[in-house]
Amino acid sequence: ETNKRKIHRVFEYEENVKMLSNYIKTKIPTISNGICHGTRRGKEQDWFSKYLNCDIFGTEISETATKFPKTIQWDFHDIKDEWINNFDFIYSNSLDHSYDIPYCLSQWSKCLKNNGMLIICGTTAHHPLASKLTADIGGYTKKSIKETITNIPQMNVIDTINPKKKKLIYLSWYYVIGQKYI
């Protein structure tokens, strides 16, 4: 399984999570929780917890999830009843692992509180053409993610952010930020 082969790797950078955390604080004054989907070994939720000083957990579909704190084994297409309207933000750099991206984002939006934020990381590696060369199921572009979020009821795209740090092999690296309104 690809996840087990890459278990010691972390896709995201701590500096970028710090930047995103500062951004979240400007939009949501009181942050109590969040969820990171597809976290492999859970570094993203550790960093968000550190910079936002709140409870963050992650999901990972692989059975390796149980080896890491604050990570549950879970298919991120599914949501629990107690997650509905419960989270201040949801972050993922693993959306290319979705078998149905519009459905997945729609499910995640149900879990956001009013004004909650959906943060999707994208790179050239997430592009549909690149995903055909990897083990990833799907792919997306900045434009397609923005359109998909905009088409979800009660969701708007509020920003696109370029990170301070990125891997040199990727020609582009960005975050699309959606926000729920009721």
Briefly describe each language-model feature range.
Residues 1-29:
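Class I SAM-dependent methyltransferase Rossmann-like catalytic core
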Residues 88-101:
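A short SAM/SAH-binding and catalytic strip from SAM-dependent methyltransferases
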Residues 115-126:
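Conserved beta-strand signature within the Rossmann-like core of class I S-adenosyl-L-methionine
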Residues 151-182:
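Core SAM-dependent methyltransferase catalytic element
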